Amino acid sequence: MRINPTTSGPGVSALEEKNQGRIVQIIGPVLDVAFPPGKMPNIYNALVVKGQDTVGQQINVTCEVQQLLGNNRVRAVAMSATDGLMRGMEVIDTGAPLSVPVGGATLGRIFNVLGEPVDNLGPVDTRTTSPIHRSAPAFIQLDTKLSIFETGIKVVDLLAPYRRGGKIGLFGGAGVGKTVLIMELINNIAKAHGGVSVFGGVGERTREGNDLYMEMKESGVINEQNIAESKVALVYGQMNEPPGARMRVGLTALTMAEYFRDVNEQDVLLFIDNIFRFVQAGSEVSALLGRMPSAVGYQPTLSTEMGSLQERITSTKEGSITSIQAVYVPADDLTDPAPATTFAHLDATTVLSRGLAAKGIYPAVDPLDSTSTMLQPRIVGEEHYETAQRVKQTLQRYKELQDIIAILGLDELSEDDRLTVARARKIERFLSQPFFVAEVFTGSPGKYVGLTETIRGFQLILSGELDSLPEQAFYLVGNIDEATAKAMNLDVESKLKK
């Protein structure tokens, strides 16, 4: 067992003999601290500054050692605002890295980077903590077998399947359904896999974090009546926090996820929103520490920092962490070092399309732009691969014909092309699906569709057996049997109207 949780409280580990130093310089969120000779703290140790400011307000600031400067001085980055700190203030070396609470008691709660609850629901009911800095699992512990992580969402499972223990990039602008898709995945992993989820809000808006929390309570992902039945733990480090907190909040969320994988032996979903903000915070810290900037002003340690986070997200023989990471692409430049470094680690991409959302097709996952390294015949099987390729070819041909249809109309197409368009429109609608977490908004019961059912449904559409059914019958249904039943109901309704 790789993980060695301790049983102290959250935040920082306490030592019987406290090693003390004093602040000698403060520049923004960066502190220089002098320690007695031979008492220097290690890199990544947590330091705590306690005292009072000039107006008598209590100060409690936690910092993390980043550099050893020589002359018995260290340079540390603060995890909260440094307002009120003064030179000469006493600093305590905790002798260990930041430690955060882990285990079932974290579910349904919101934490900051230090593992302190910020939801006004009282202390966390656990004394088990884990340090946020840890090496990735050894190769011998990894589960190297390639297997599909079934989500129950048709468009994902068929066209861009997720790898168990893989990393998925989620691309999409505002208002196209990222949050609802994330909540549905959290719900489905809990019901179908007996797993849990951890959401790491890295450097995003406080309002979005609050909206997500409220929507999770409304949809039942977080159970207010019985918090222990919740399916997700939330860790937030918003835009307004110092760069140190934004740089480490992803590790806090990952540490909580690792406990569920290594100790509880569960499948875990780890959401990081947004992975670009992790890089951005690292860039700010790097500049504050005086490192020479690299390409486009990013930190010279960009690949190392990204690798140390991403390599801990993996499948072991005990369980798996499957990570879905929202990726912001600055100025839509895919060659920017931040997204380019992220892409090197991704196994699949899920691209959300505003065009599909405008048509009312949810989830608005773009079937042609979304990709997966798992979509290979030797991994998913010939039947799945062939069906997915034929679906993509049909949709691609429909896309090519749309300009002709817009100018000349459907009647000018050949018989074969008209058939392709009709099937493509059915496929497009069949890729939509009612979600469990959207039941409260739509009134339609949610559907979990197994991979076998998904493949069978699309094969029937492609074979032409369902050409006589109206395309409306395929909209917002689960499996193909529901579509045929809906077609019969529509037929009965139309006859009654006549």
UniProtKB/Swiss-Prot annotation:
One of its GO terms (cellular component) is chloroplast thylakoid membrane. SUPFAM superfamilies: C-terminal domain of alpha and beta subunits of F1 ATP synthase, N-terminal domain of alpha and beta subunits of F1 ATP synthase, P-loop containing nucleoside triphosphate hydrolases. It is an enzyme of class 7 (translocase). Belongs to the ATPase alpha/beta chains family. ATP binds at G172, G173, A174, G175, V176, G177, K178, T179. It comes from Nandina domestica (Heavenly bamboo). GO terms for biological process: proton motive force-driven mitochondrial ATP synthesis. This is ATP synthase subunit beta, chloroplastic. CDD domains: ATP-synt_F1_beta_C (cd18110), ATP-synt_F1_beta_N (cd18115), F1-ATPase_beta_CD (cd01133). Produces ATP from ADP in the presence of a proton gradient across the membrane. The catalytic sites are hosted primarily by the beta subunits. It catalyses: ATP + H2O + 4 H(+)(in) = ADP + phosphate + 5 H(+)(out). F-type ATPases have 2 components, CF(1) - the catalytic core - and CF(0) - the membrane proton channel. CF(1) has five subunits: alpha(3), beta(3), gamma(1), delta(1), epsilon(1). CF(0) has four main subunits: a(1), b(1), b'(1) and c(9-12). HAMAP family: ATP_synth_beta_bact. GO terms for molecular function: ATP binding; ATP hydrolysis activity; proton-transporting ATP synthase activity, rotational mechanism. It is found in: Plastid, Chloroplast thylakoid membrane. Pfam families: ATP-synt_ab, ATP-synt_ab_N, ATP-synt_VA_C. Keywords: ATP synthesis, ATP-binding, CF(1), Chloroplast, Hydrogen ion transport, Ion transport, Membrane, Nucleotide-binding, Plastid, Thylakoid, Translocase, Transport.
